[in-house]
């Protein structure tokens, strides 16, 4: 697993070809004044790096369709768009995470579409449009396991 590389600007991490800002970065601090994520979307979680590592060893098709569920600040979405040229739809239940995701997509020079939706409400027909559906650290409550299993079942039909 590659080490995180600190770049000259404070509170910026570089790993797997993407830049992610820490909770203490000046842009993030500014965003936090107006946007307060409520569903664990207050930072980039370590599990995003684990997923990036996995996807580095199990490459996605170039320019494929990717949906990230529970995207938070969008680290995995940014990685897929940057490394594989994927067209990404980032989905989260908390609308307050999208300004943070937009900053990350901007500093990494990628475009990411996003939508505020409960992943248990996404229809199988829509899920079937994506070659890859990813998510990391999305079962932080026991009550999320069954809806996630149901999502996988709908996606595979």
Predicted feature locations:
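S-adenosylmethionine-dependent methyltransferases
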Residues: 1-157
């Amino acid at each position: 697993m590659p080490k995180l590389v600190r770049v000259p600007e404070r509170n910026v991490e570089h790993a797997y070809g993407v830049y992610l800002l820490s909770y203490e970065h000046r842009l993030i601090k500014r965003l936090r004044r107006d946007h307060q994520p409520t569903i664990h979307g207050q930072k980039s979680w370590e599990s995003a790096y684990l997923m990036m590592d996995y996807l580095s060893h199990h490459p996605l098709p170039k320019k494929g369709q990717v949906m990230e569920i529970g995207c938070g600040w969008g680290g995995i979405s940014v990685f897929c768009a940057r490394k594989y040229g994927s067209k990404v739809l980032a989905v989260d239940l908390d609308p307050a995470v999208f300004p943070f995701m937009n900053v990350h997509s901007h500093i990494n020079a990628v475009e990411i579409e996003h939508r505020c939706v409960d992943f248990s409400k996404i229809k199988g027909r829509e899920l079937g449009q994506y070659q890859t559906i990813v998510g990391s650290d999305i079962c932080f409550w026991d009550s999320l396991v069954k809806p996630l299993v149901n999502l996988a079942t709908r996606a595979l039909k």
